[in-house]
């Protein structure tokens, strides 16, 4: 499979190595906007750029009919438009706030816990915390937003908000610290006890491997997809 990497930062470099060990060819490594010339006729694009660049990058590739696997966060207000462009061009688009198997199992655990806690929302206050390296541009992380959305769908919360809150707003505390790959904590606290679930990434390899597996999976498919469908969760 021929892969074009759009966004060649730390994640791009790790994806490059993992993809090659799985027998794939990297035909483009881009930190600039994609064109037909510099993409070099790939079977799929893996997009890990920046919040500012993601929309334009994805839009261009989908309009050429090239499948896109995207892990860039911080641009999701435009995701419905991208999904529409994907359908209009009979293309394939897969977005993941996190491609790690462990995180996606954590998503499922978080959703189940939220369902169990719903009858007790008046007794327990729920808060989220995410910790990432100082180079991460967006706050909160896409993973934290995904966790929050699953909690909101299964609770009395109406929306999430950055920083601690009370009432109908679900608080997300975002910390930027040294070179932390990613830690996410969901806490339910009452006057008498506390329930906590936590996921800690030790490096970026799990994210990168998941992105490569997603790019293998999307070949031959049409439509908008998520990591859950790739992993069968």
Regions found by a protein language model. Name each.
Residues 67, 82-100, 117, 121:
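Rossmann-fold dehydrogenase core element
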Residues 2, 10-39, 122-233:
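C-terminal substrate-binding/catalytic lobe of Rossmann-fold NAD(P)-dependent oxidoreductases
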Residues 39-46, 62-67:
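Short acidic/histidine-rich motifs immediately flanking catalytic phosphotransfer sites
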Residues 72-93, 104, 109-112:
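Rossmann-fold NAD(P)-binding glycine/threonine-rich loop
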Residues 51-71, 80-82:
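Rossmann-fold NAD(P) dinucleotide-binding segment
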Residues 32-34, 72-76, 99:
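Short, acidic/turn-prone active-site loops that include or flank metal/cofactor-
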């Amino acid at each position: 499979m021929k892969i074009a990497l759009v966004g060649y930062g730390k994640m791009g470099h790790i994806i490059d190595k993992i993809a090659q060990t799985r027998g794939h060819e990297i035909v483009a490594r881009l930190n600039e906007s994609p064109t037909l010339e510099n993409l070099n006729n790939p079977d799929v694009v893996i997009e890990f750029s920046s919040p500012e660049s993601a929309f334009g990058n994805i839009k261009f590739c989908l309009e050429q009919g090239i499948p896109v696997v995207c892990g860039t966060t911080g641009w999701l207000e435009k995701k419905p438009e991208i999904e529409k462009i994907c359908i209009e061009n009979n293309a394939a688009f897969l977005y993941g706030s996190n491609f790690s198997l462990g995180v996606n199992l954590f998503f499922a655990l978080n959703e189940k816990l939220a369902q169990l806690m719903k009858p007790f929302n008046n007794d327990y206050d729920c808060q989220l915390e995410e910790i990432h390296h100082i180079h991460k541009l967006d706050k909160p992380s896409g993973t934290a937003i995904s966790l929050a959305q699953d909690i909101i769908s299964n609770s009395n919360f109406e929306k999430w908000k950055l920083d601690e809150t009370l009432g109908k707003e679900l608080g997300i505390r975002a910390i930027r610290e040294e070179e932390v790959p990613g830690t996410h904590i969901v806490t339910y606290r009452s006057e008498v006890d506390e329930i906590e679930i936590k996921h800690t990434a030790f490096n970026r390899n799990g994210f990168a491997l998941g992105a490569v597996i997603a790019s293998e999976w999307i070949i031959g498919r049409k439509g908008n997809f998520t990591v859950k469908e790739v992993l069968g969760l």
